[in-house]
Amino acid sequence: MLTIGVIAIQGAVSEHITALEKVSRGLNYRIVRIKKKGIIQNCDGLVIPGGESTTISRLLRFEGLDKEILKNQHIPMMGTCAGLIILSNYQDEDAEGLGLMDMQVKRNAFGRQAESFEYPLEVKVFDSPFNAIFIRAPAIKQVGNGIDVLARFKEYSVAAQQGNKLALSFHPELSDDLRFHKYFLQLFDS
């Protein structure tokens, strides 16, 4: 049985768990919430949900989860919204990425909460558009070697993959479309 951990310190944790349970139904997966250290090393994959990147970054450090993520960086990971920032090279006085994906990001690239929106994205790995939900979303400004851009919006990349790491500017867990969660499970074979 494969275990997927969902960092459960902020964000749409329950929605990610529900989506993962739906796409893994009938398969050999177990989904667990991670609030404290000592669990990540038993996981075969990890989801870092959205939320407020400063808060998530601080809580990851406070709980020691940042070190556990780095120690287990070989496992598949999906970061959504603020989770994208955590996977990236992002650095400022308030939040710090873990540098697991070679990309530079911009926080709140699409405005504040009131400017949240949905957009039908053309995604490289899907046959039809994905209705992406952007809420105070970050954007990928620049990618390094080994990054495969899966989707763009305006001048920014908003979905990217590097090996078995998947970073999304938007919130697939808030949609009824489960394709990104299914795609994440495919990363377990790569």
Language-model region placement:
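Structural motif
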Residues: 47-49, 134, 167-169
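Cysteine-nucleophile active-site neighborhood
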Residues: 53-122
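Pocket-forming structural segment of enzyme catalytic cores
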Residues: 94-156
